[in-house]
């Protein structure tokens, strides 16, 4: 037998291409391809018919597959809804949208907090009462009003040394502290001694007694 005989017998088993693709779709499926199975209802005869109908509608003009999504094709063939394909993607996208904005908001909040802290440190003012009051700091000079000075001069004219009780009374009267009254009288006595230096080299007994009484706390 020649090779031509084998070729003729091979092609005679299949119909012509014009008869196979006359409608522009796939040939009709055999019964074994879509056999009904009671355990798999999605692949029954009804689903096979719908799948064949959907496949016939894919190529009405020769290139209509681009206008239909893959989800629609599989949904029509296997009896699934298009929304079932997004059941895993939608929660994942929601989680991403919920996590990423939160991270950016936290980063922005931390940056604003740092900026506010730096601005607060740069604008921090030190008031006089906030400075240290140690012995290394030079103490400012105490100033007295004219009324306070006049009353202290009157008291010094009568008594150059004050008892503690009298110092407390004058401090309450002139709105001063006991320490301020004591310092003023000490300075006034030093001034008075310089003015009256020619009067005598030492102090009298009365002055020493008053000084001892004044130093009692």
Curated annotation (Swiss-Prot):
Coiled coil: none
Protein's cellular compartments: Nucleus
GO biological process, one term: positive regulation of branching involved in ureteric bud morphogenesis
Sequence segments annotated as region (Disordered): 194-217
Residue ranges of the motif Antp-type hexapeptide: 126-131
Superkingdom as given in the UniProt entry: Eukaryota
Gene3D superfamilies: Homeodomain-like
Chief place of localization: nucleus
Keywords linked to the UniProt accession: Developmental protein, DNA-binding, Homeobox, Nucleus, Transcription, Transcription regulation
UniProt cross-references to InterPro entries, sorted A to Z: Antp_homeobox, HD, HD_metazoa, Homeobox_antennapedia, Homeobox_Antennapedia_CS, Homeobox_CS, Homeodomain-like_sf
Gene Ontology cellular-component annotations: chromatin; cytosol; nuclear body; nucleoplasm; nucleus
DNA-binding region extent: 137-196
A single GO molecular function term of this UniProt record: DNA-binding transcription factor activity
Subunit structure: Forms a DNA-binding heterodimer with transcription factor PBX1.
PANTHER family named among the record's database cross-references: HOMEOBOX PROTEIN HOX, HOMEOBOX PROTEIN HOX-B7
Protein role: Sequence-specific transcription factor which is part of a developmental regulatory system that provides cells with specific positional identities on the anterior-posterior axis.
Similarity-based family: Belongs to the Antp homeobox family.
Full protein name: Homeobox protein Hox-B7
Record lineage: Eukaryota, Metazoa, Chordata, Craniata, Vertebrata
């Amino acid at each position: 037998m020649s090779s031509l005989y084998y070729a003729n017998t091979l092609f005679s088993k299949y119909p012509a291409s014009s008869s196979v693709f006359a409608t522009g779709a796939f040939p009709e499926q055999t019964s074994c391809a879509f056999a009904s199975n009671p355990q798999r209802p999605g692949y029954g005869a009804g689903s096979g018919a719908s799948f064949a109908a959907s496949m016939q509608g894919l190529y009405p003009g020769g290139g209509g597959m681009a206008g239909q999504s893959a989800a629609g094709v599989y949904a029509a063939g296997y009896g699934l809804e298009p929304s079932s394909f997004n059941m895993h993607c939608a929660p994942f996208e929601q989680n991403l949208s919920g996590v990423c904005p939160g991270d950016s908001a936290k980063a922005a909040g931390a940056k604003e907090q740092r900026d506010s802290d730096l601005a607060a440190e740069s604008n921090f003012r030190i008031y006089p009462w906030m400075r240290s009051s140690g012995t290394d700091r030079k103490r400012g000079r105490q100033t007295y009003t004219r009324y306070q000075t006049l009353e202290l001069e009157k008291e010094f004219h009568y008594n150059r040394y004050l008892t503690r009780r009298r110092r407390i009374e004058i401090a309450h009267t002139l709105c001063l502290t006991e320490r301020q009254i004591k310092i003023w009288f000490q300075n006034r006595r030093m001034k008075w001694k310089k003015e009256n230096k020619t009067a005598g080299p030492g102090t009298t007994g009365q002055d020493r007694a008053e000084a001892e009484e004044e130093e009692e706390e």
